[in-house]
């Protein structure tokens, strides 16, 4: 199917160097709040790219759950495919596609596990059904039917029928520690504005990139 004629021009205000915060995480927070205020559906949804030992790129959508100057945090099963790839190659890229604002943010960096205390704090805040789900799913493993999954849910509900549900030892968070962050603003005629922050020691350099 030829879809080459699917296009639209971007009618966005420009992004200039003087409008940028010197700290890319502060700049990200500004844009994140813009996306949330604009009603972007799940503005914390991000594409997570990883590569394992075989060199084959992998990609999936996950949810950002916390960010600060130390990095960007998401949670998953430590037995999942993404976790295996991060063990083999602890580097990743993130993409926030805020299409409704003609914006996107790309982040590249090293990846580390968060502390057990951080994982427990977030796990304890999750709805009970999601906590059960974390115990049930052997993420990325083959299962022969949906019925088996629902059977495991029923078993876990009986097991944890009262009291708090403990944090699984195989579940927790990762932090992407940024080394590069790019802010992209769509402009007319595909002459977009792109600014890249590159970590230099304890600070950042900012440079404009050609579209």
UniProtKB/Swiss-Prot annotation:
GO terms for molecular function: FMN binding; pyridoxamine phosphate oxidase activity. Gene3D superfamilies: Electron Transport, Fmn-binding Protein, Chain A. It catalyses: pyridoxamine 5'-phosphate + O2 + H2O = pyridoxal 5'-phosphate + H2O2 + NH4(+); pyridoxine 5'-phosphate + O2 = pyridoxal 5'-phosphate + H2O2. FMN binds at residues 60-65, 75-76, 81-82, 104, 139-140, 184, 194. Substrate binds at residues 65, 122, 126, 130, 190-192. Keywords: Flavoprotein, FMN, Oxidoreductase, Pyridoxine biosynthesis. Pathway: Cofactor metabolism; pyridoxal 5'-phosphate salvage; pyridoxal 5'-phosphate from pyridoxamine 5'-phosphate: step 1/1; Cofactor metabolism; pyridoxal 5'-phosphate salvage; pyridoxal 5'-phosphate from pyridoxine 5'-phosphate: step 1/1. NCBIfam families: pdxH, PRK05679.1. Belongs to the pyridoxamine 5'-phosphate oxidase family. HAMAP family: PdxH. PANTHER family: PYRIDOXINE-5'-PHOSPHATE OXIDASE (PTHR10851:SF0), PYRIDOXINE-5-PHOSPHATE OXIDASE (PTHR10851). This is Pyridoxine/pyridoxamine 5'-phosphate oxidase. The gene is pdxH.
């Amino acid at each position: 199917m030829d879809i080459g004629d699917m296009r639209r021009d971007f009618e966005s205000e420009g992004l200039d160097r003087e409008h940028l915060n010197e700290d890319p995480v502060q700049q990200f927070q500004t844009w994140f709040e813009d996306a949330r205020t604009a009603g972007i559906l799940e503005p914390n949804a991000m594409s997570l790219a990883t590569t394992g030992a075989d060199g084959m790129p992998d990609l999936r959508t996950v949810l950002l759950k916390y960010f600060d100057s130390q990095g960007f945090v998401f949670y998953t099963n430590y037995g999942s495919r993404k976790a295996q790839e991060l063990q083999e190659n602890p580097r990743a890229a993130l993409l926030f596609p805020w299409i409704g604002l003609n914006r996107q943010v790309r982040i590249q960096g090293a990846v580390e596990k968060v502390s057990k205390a951080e994982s427990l704090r977030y796990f304890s805040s999750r709805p009970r059904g999601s906590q059960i789900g974390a115990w049930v799913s052997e993420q990325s493993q083959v299962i022969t039917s949906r019925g088996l999954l629902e059977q495991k849910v029923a078993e876990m509900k009986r097991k944890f029928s009262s009291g708090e549900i403990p944090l699984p030892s195989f579940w927790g968070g990762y932090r992407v520690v940024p080394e590069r962050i790019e802010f992209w603003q769509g402009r007319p005629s595909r002459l977009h504005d792109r600014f890249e922050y590159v970590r230099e020691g304890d600070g950042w350099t900012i440079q404009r990139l050609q579209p």
